[in-house]
Design a protein with these regions (language model features):
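Class I SAM-dependent methyltransferase SAM/SAH-binding core
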Residues: 64-66, 70-118
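A short glycine-rich, Lys/Arg-flanked "PGG" loop and its adjoining helix->strand segment in the class I
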Residues: 142-154
């Protein structure tokens, strides 16, 4: 198994974004089923408590979910009164999200096919920007962070949950990754190839994220490397061995 190597952002393969889009298009159906099961499990309440402790208090706030996938955060937060907008690069994922949220008291959530690096919203439009397991897929995560800063209101909150999944693929026994137990071997290998195409795979995170967010102009930037201990303490069908972190920042 080849080792990860540092790739300058400007030297990434031209087709990396298309490869990421293709991968998630193929996974959209099974991924949606997995999120349906997660939304009907104890994990929904676990994530609801996790997010509400770190988001602005009270309902009615506009929240942008970047890389929304099948709409799990919308299913968790829309019933709490948050005005949810989900964006994803993959049309198939957006289709799955609309269907799933229509059945989970989250029909008011809005969904758009949109690039995380180019969110087409006015400056200062959202009270919060949230994301889960997205930034590891981005060819230009610093540009994405800059755009998320732009669309946030002054005092708005950024919450990003992610992990060093590329390093974890080489570090952990993949039999421990129960969340991917039903993912086809060909897609696992496709994901592995994407890891090696992305500069972000070799970065030291969340240290890199904290540095970039401070440089952009966020304040109160904090990295919590214990998020995975809270959110993935049970080895069930949602378990991933990778050490999830949470980066929180305020505009």
């Amino acid at each position: 198994m080849s080792r990860l190597s540092e790739i300058p952002f400007e030297s990434e393969p031209a087709g990396v974004k298309a490869a990421v889009k293709s991968y998630w298009s193929k996974r959209s159906g099974s991924f949606s089923e997995h999120k349906h099961d997660e939304a009907h499990s104890y994990k929904a309440e676990l994530w609801r408590n996790e997010l509400c402790e770190r988001l602005p208090a009270g309902g009615g706030f506009r929240i942008l979910d970047v890389g929304c996938g099948a709409g799990f955060f919308e299913m968790v937060l829309a019933p709490m009164g948050y005005r949810m907008t989900g964006i994803d690069l993959t049309p198939e994922m957006i289709s799955q999200a609309k269907q799933l949220c229509g059945r989970h008291r989250a029909a008011a959530a809005e969904f758009y096919v949109m690039d995380a690096v180019h969110p087409d919203f006015p400056d200062g439009y959202f009270d919060a920007v949230i994301s889960r397991n997205l930034t590891w897929t981005l060819p230009h995560p610093a540009e994405a962070y800059n755009e998320w800063h732009r669309v946030l209101k002054q005092g708005g909150v950024l919450l990003n949950y992610d992990a060093e999944y590329a390093k974890g693929f080489h570090k952990y026994d993949q039999a421990e990754n129960l969340a991917h137990e039903k993912v086809e071997d060909s897609l696992v290998e496709e994901c592995h190839n994407i890891y090696h195409m992305l500069s972000v795979s070799a970065l030291n995170r969340p240290e890199w994220d904290v540095k970039v967010l401070n440089e952009i102009g966020f304040r109160s930037v904090e990295a919590d490397i214990s998020a995975g201990d809270r959110l993935y303490s049970v080895k069930d069908q949602f378990y991933m061995p990778d050490r999830m972190f949470c980066v929180r920042a305020v505009k």
